[in-house]
A protein has these predicted regions:
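Long, contiguous binding/interaction regions
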Residues: 1-45, 49-163
Length: 163
């Protein structure tokens, strides 16, 4: 099962490396990884998307909590949460393809952020399934390049990750 693990850790050199090393040493796969500073400049928030049984996720959480730099660990998928991902996709857009791509981007609430004679660069934000559906909806042969951030998540309502 897919899990979104949110980790609050000290914002210092080597902290990210130790977390990634923990996953690697134990053979756990990281599907996506995002890291950014929080409202407290001394802390970073890491979002790890991984897969595994409940037992595996429990082991990952326990191992993460043992790292000195880790302040708090939460499996967001245990409760209500919001997940988003950003995708930039550059597509070939010539002739009648241009209007079709524009319509498809509009349907998926994407924005065309760069236009050249032969290409569109489209920005989409949403759940992984939405971004995957957009890729499925367009002609794959028109895709020139794709960049995705990976998942980021936050608990709903009063559920927060703070010290």
């Amino acid at each position: 099962m897919r899990h979104i693990i949110s980790v609050l850790l000290e914002n210092e050199a080597g902290a990210l490396s130790r977390v990634v090393g923990l996953f690697s040493a134990r053979g756990y796969n990281i599907e996506t990884l995002t890291v950014a500073p929080t409202e407290d400049a001394t802390l970073s928030r890491m979002t790890v998307v991984t897969t595994g049984s409940d037992d595996i996720i429990e082991q990952i959480t326990k191992h993460l909590n043992r790292l000195i730099e880790v302040v708090k660990v939460v499996d967001l998928t245990e409760g209500q949460h919001i997940e988003r991902e950003l995708m930039l996709i550059k597509v070939r857009a010539v002739g009648k393809e241009r209007e079709e791509l524009k319509r498809t981007a509009d349907i998926f609430r994407g924005r065309i952020i760069d236009v050249t004679e032969k290409t569109y660069t489209i920005e989409l934000t949403g759940a992984k399934t939405k971004l995957d559906a957009f890729i499925d909806a367009i002609d794959r042969s028109s895709i020139l390049e794709t960049v995705r951030t990976g998942g980021s998540g936050i608990g709903r309502g009063e559920r927060i990750l703070k010290v």
